[in-house]
């Protein structure tokens, strides 16, 4: 299958690209910066800009040749303060990219067969007590609005293109993301829960997320919205306890919420608040997780990558 990949040069893409190559797909990767990725065609463009999708552009030509598209594009959510300018970037990098992509798909003489588009569990808002499935309504905060607009943009694809939306939880990998930031601190023995420790963490091992995307591209039974999370969300306190145990290090030194708010402003809510997002539809499909429990996920991501089985599949 010839695939066009957007937003696949970061944390998820580092595993997704070789997994898709191993499955025999031919890849064109879009990046805003020049970079070397073995075995793929690379297009240097900013997909959030309408000009990048102009008739005759390399991006437009690649789309017209693609049988499938994976769109994970979006600036990181919780890495700096949510100033008005940064919020604009968070929205534009996701929503404008998706709108331009969908408009190009609509006008393409040969639309792709499938679009796998990212969203996030932030769609549901936050709660200390409620749990959320794909049927739960949207929340009422900034991230809910962002995810809602993102999904609406993706939902405008023509009926001829099968749409799969993945509401992604916290992606666990040792080389980046939330866990990648926590590991150096925990390894020195100074780790601990962030904020109250009672906030929920809906997580997924990166390998399982990549397997889900790989499977959804070719399995015609995938359609609609899926919570891309493991079925065992945990409170932050439990996450840190298990991480400390996996590293044989203590997890006793909490990071006070006010400190994080000082650093990230409103963006601290991503870390200090959470939700229990349950993968009801994936479980109904019988999706096979390589790491269904947190201890299995930590064992997987903390051991050498070569030991991890990455082939997609279900029971």
What spans do the regions from the language model cover?
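Glycine/proline-rich active-site loop of Rossmann-fold NAD(P)-dependent oxidoreductases
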Residues: 160, 172-181, 216-226
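C-terminal amphipathic/interface module of NAD(P)-dependent oxidoreductases
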Residues: 269-315
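N-terminal Rossmann NAD(P)H-binding glycine-rich loop of SDR-like oxidoreductase domains
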Residues: 3-23
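Conserved beta-loop-beta element that borders a ligand/cofactor-binding pocket
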Residues: 119, 152-174
């Amino acid at each position: 299958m010839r695939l066009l990949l957007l937003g696949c040069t970061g944390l998820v893409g580092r595993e997704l690209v070789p997994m898709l190559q191993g499955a025999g797909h031919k890849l064109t990767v879009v990046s805003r910066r020049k970079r070397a990725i073995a075995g793929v065609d690379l297009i240097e463009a900013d997909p959030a800009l309408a000009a990048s999708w102009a008739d005759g552009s390399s991006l437009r030509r690649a789309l017209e040749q693609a049988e499938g598209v994976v769109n994970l594009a979006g600036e990181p959510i919780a890495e700096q303060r949510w100033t008005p300018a940064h919020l604009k970037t968070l929205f534009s990098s996701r929503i404008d990219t998706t709108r331009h992509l969908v408009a190009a798909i609509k006008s393409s003489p040969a639309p792709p067969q499938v679009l796998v588009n990212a969203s996030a569990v932030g769609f549901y808002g936050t709660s200390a007590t409620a749990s959320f499935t794909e049927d739960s309504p949207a929340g009422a905060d900034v991230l809910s609005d962002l995810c809602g607009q993102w999904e609406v943009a993706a939902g405008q694809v023509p009926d001829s293109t099968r749409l799969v939306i993945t509401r992604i939880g916290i992606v666990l990998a040792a080389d980046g993301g939330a866990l990648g930031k926590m590991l150096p601190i925990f390894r020195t023995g100074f780790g601990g829960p962030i904020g109250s420790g009672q906030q929920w963490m809906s997580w997924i091992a990166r390998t399982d997320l990549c397997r889900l995307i790989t499977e959804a591209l070719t399995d015609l039974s995938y359609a609609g919205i899926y919570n891309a999370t493991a079925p065992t969300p945990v409170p932050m306190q439990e996450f840190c306890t298990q991480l400390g145990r996996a590293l044989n290090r203590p997890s006793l030194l909490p990071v006070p919420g006010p400190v994080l708010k000082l650093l990230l402003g409103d963006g601290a809510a991503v870390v200090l608040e959470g939700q229990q997002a349950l993968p009801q539809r994936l479980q109904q499909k019988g999706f096979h997780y390589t790491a269904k429990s947190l201890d299995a996920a930590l064992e997987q991501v903390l051991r050498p990558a070569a030991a991890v089985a990455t082939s997609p599949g279900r029971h």
